[in-house]
Amino acid sequence: MAEITIRGAGIFGLSVAWACVQRGAVVQVIDPNGPAAGSSGGIVGALAPHVPENWNAKKAFQRDSLLMAEGFWQAVEQAGGGNAGYARKGRLQPVADDAALALAQQRAETAKALWQGQATWSVIRASDTPWQPDSPTGWLIHDT
């Protein structure tokens, strides 16, 4: 008999189930649509640190959680004998106008101090990337 029942076999539900099993729990996962059916409606499948201004404990917790992801997914791969598909590539966001560019540059400086090289927020030229979203200014934010 399961000690814990998790509803949802998407990335979050399966990750919670894995963490519970690692701690010795007996777990069952229930999802009427099957594993990874995409019913959560998420379109990105990615997480990134919060913007650096107004830094608080919640934002620090999310950043710290994201930093633990590499070790988590390595353990999943080792247990499963396959590639979990984890990659820390970052995301690209177009910069809309001069005001957004100034804000992005300010955030890059704040991120350096707060994230201490563990994650990055960079302002880069769109032309410097092999693929880029349309950017009215020709600039992108790349955060990891």
Where are these regions (language model features)?
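Conserved FAD-binding subdomain of flavin-dependent enzymes
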Residues: A19-Q22, N33-R91, L101-A113
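Flavin (FAD/FMN) cofactor-binding and adjacent substrate-gating region
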Residues: N83-T144
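Short beta-strand/turn micro-motifs composed of small residues
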Residues: G8, D31, V95
